[in-house]
């Protein structure tokens, strides 16, 4: 029997200003869905896998074809419903309603675990959407680069006087998310040694200029890191190996990195983490014929790696969990102090979330990189005093290779996002841009996620696991007129550990789009300020007052 999730065809998004659908509001999700499966974007496009273990864009290839066909015929007063990657219905709504509403991998809490999900997955009854895979707004490794850069810069501020020159970062994983780490480290001024078990992933990062060099030798990797740091150079190297083996070996040798983290796909113990002593080929085969053995061995190996990370932490080296739930896996394997070192959000990012600042991103549907150059210039024009952001845009232009449709990630917050959206829409209207653009974000944002081991770890009021907030975010973005809205479960940290929402809005140059953009790009980050203000963060409370938010039970207005 053929595998409905495997097909050797090559998918790439259309370019240019000619429509394949009835309007840009349906052309936009069509192009972004196809862009998610571009071979220059996706991790395993022939299997519909975009990134993050088994994060898919559609449930099966038949479902992909049905979604494409439906989007091509969808009217501007209709909404397509997508249930875990399957197009299940089209309903009459209105022109300001979303054209697509997506729900991926959501399970009733008692059954929200990998065992139950995997059973459904085998029967083609569910699909793991990760965050931006199943919501059709993945832009390649760039999508996480700036967030990783901001994290490393803040770590440098807190621990090394704001200067990472001559320092180096140890990490693991060069997949769709982890692949951003070497480039982010170099942009922040540090060297990076990234351990990756799958050589094809390291080669992908070499090809797209996210990592500088590759080796199979730990000794060679350490020698290069030593030479670069002594010379004050910021460069990166991928070491082909298993993080569960390399991290303890470095501890044993007494090697002391300046920062330690990890972005292996530890959230998925079957598909995301190579067990100690296994070959990649053996691992891939046993994922299909003996997944329980894979999970058992992977979890035991994660415990070994986290123990090494604890050893680094106890030696005084700044060490953080980068949101893959590896500490939780180690805790469940009996490592009682697995959470002794913090996650990256409470350690470095939460003050940004308090002001609604997060991973704002946009993509040029024209396919022309010049459209991104023009929008970069517009960001600088509208935010003239944000020199940190200008520096980021300059580095991004120089260092980041586009994957698929040209795109840009740019962390901005409440008060700025809607201004940029309106300006971009005006650029489409007056012909400065060759075609419309879409604006979206990661689900990792200030008001759109509940994830107690990542984005909402150690909330001030103890509300880490309250998931009303992403539900409200999705509802508000739907009411505000986003072009498509998604509500997912399990992204980043795995089944049972997160709920999160996403939105994308199309700048098609119309006055109707102006009104939608102003609502969506104000309300979306405002929910993040509201959520953090409700938790008692002074920065969020002050920002809510400054921006004039009406929060009756929080501000009494």
UniProtKB/Swiss-Prot annotation:
PROSITE patterns: UROCANASE. It comes from the Bacteria. GO terms for molecular function: urocanate hydratase activity. Its main location: cytoplasm. Its EC number is 4.2.1.49. Pathway: Amino-acid degradation; L-histidine degradation into L-glutamate; N-formimidoyl-L-glutamate from L-histidine: step 2/3. It is an enzyme of class 4 (lyase). Binds 1 NAD(+) per subunit. GO terms for cellular component: cytoplasm. The keyword Magnesium does not apply. NAD(+) binds at residues 52-53, 130, 176-178, 196, 201, 242-243, 263-267, 273-274, 322, 492. Pfam families: Urocanase, Urocanase_C, Urocanase_N. GO terms for biological process: L-histidine catabolic process to glutamate and formamide; L-histidine catabolic process to glutamate and formate. Residues 1-20 are annotated as: Disordered. It is found in: Cytoplasm. Keywords: Cytoplasm, Histidine metabolism, Lyase, NAD. Its cofactor is NAD(+). InterPro entries: Urocanase, Urocanase-like, Urocanase_C, Urocanase_central_sf, Urocanase_CS, Urocanase_N, Urocanase_Rossmann-like, Urocanase_sf. It catalyses: 4-imidazolone-5-propanoate = trans-urocanate + H2O. The active site is at residue 410. PANTHER family: UROCANATE HYDRATASE. Catalyzes the conversion of urocanate to 4-imidazolone-5-propionate. Belongs to the urocanase family. This is Urocanate hydratase. It comes from Brucella suis (strain ATCC 23445 / NCTC 10510). The gene is hutU.
């Amino acid at each position: 029997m053929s595998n409905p999730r495997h097909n050797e065809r090559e998918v790439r998004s259309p370019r240019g200003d000619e429509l394949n659908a009835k309007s840009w509001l349906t052309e936009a999700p069509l192009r972004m869905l196809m862009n998610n499966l571009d071979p220059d974007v996706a991790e395993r496009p022939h299997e519909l896998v975009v990134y993050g273990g088994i994060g898919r864009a559609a449930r099966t290839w038949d479902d992909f074809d049905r979604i494409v066909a439906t989007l091509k015929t969808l009217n501007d007063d209709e909404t397509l419903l997508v249930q875990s990657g399957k197009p299940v219905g089209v309903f009459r709504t209105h022109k300001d309603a979303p054209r697509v509403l997506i729900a991926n991998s959501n399970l009733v809490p008692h059954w929200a675990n990998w065992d139950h999900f995997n059973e459904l997955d085998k029967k083609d009854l569910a699909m793991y959407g990760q965050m931006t895979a199943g919501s059709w707004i993945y832009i390649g490794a760039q999508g996480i680069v700036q967030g990783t850069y901001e994290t490393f810069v803040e770590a440098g501020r807190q621990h090394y006087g704001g200067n990472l020159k001559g320092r180096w970062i140890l990490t693991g994983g060069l997949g769709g998310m982890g692949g951003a780490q070497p480039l982010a480290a170099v942009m922040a001024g540090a060297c990076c040694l990234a351990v990756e078990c799958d050589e094809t992933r390291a080669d992908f990062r070499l090809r797209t200029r996210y990592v500088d060099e590759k080796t199979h030798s730990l000794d060679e990797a350490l020698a290069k890191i030593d030479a670069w740091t002594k010379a004050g150079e910021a460069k990166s190297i991928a070491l082909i190996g298993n993080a569960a083996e390399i991290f303890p070996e470095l501890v044993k040798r007494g090697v002391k990195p300046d920062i330690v983290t990890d972005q292996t796909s530890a959230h998925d113990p079957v598909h995301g983490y190579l067990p100690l002593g296994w070959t990649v080929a053996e691992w891939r085969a046993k994922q299909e014929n003996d997944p329980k053995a894979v999970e058992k061995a992977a979890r035991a190996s994660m415990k070994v790696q986290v123990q090494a990370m604890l050893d680094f932490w106890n030696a005084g080296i700044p060490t953080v969990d980068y949101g893959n739930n590896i500490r939780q896996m180690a805790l469940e394997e009996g490592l009682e102090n697995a959470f002794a070192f913090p996650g990256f959000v409470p350690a470095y990012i939460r003050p940004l979330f308090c002001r609604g600042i997060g991973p704002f991103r946009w993509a040029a549907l024209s396919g022309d990189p010049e459209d991104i150059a023009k929008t970069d210039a517009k960001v600088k024009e509208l935010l003239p005093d944000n020199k940190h952001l200008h520096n980021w845009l300059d580095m991004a232009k120089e260092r980041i290779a586009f994957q698929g449709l040209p795109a840009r990630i740019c962390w901005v917050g409440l008060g700025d996002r809607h201004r940029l959206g309106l300006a971009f829409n005006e650029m489409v209207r007056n012909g400065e841009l060759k075609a419309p653009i879409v604006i979206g974000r990661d689900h990792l944002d200030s008001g759109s996620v509940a994830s107690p081991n990542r984005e909402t770890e150690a909330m001030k009021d103890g509300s880490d696991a309250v998931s009303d907030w992403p539900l409200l975010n999705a509802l508000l973005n739907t009411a505000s007129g986003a072009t498509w809205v998604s509500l997912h479960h399990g992204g980043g940290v795995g089944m049972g550990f997160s709920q999160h929402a996403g939105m994308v809005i199309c700048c098609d140059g119309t006055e109707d789009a102006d009104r939608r953009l102003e609502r969506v790009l104000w309300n979306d980050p405002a929910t993040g300020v509201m959520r953090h203000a409700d938790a008692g963060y002074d920065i969020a409370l002050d920002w809510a007052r400054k921006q004039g938010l009406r929060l009756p039970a929080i501000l009494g207005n």
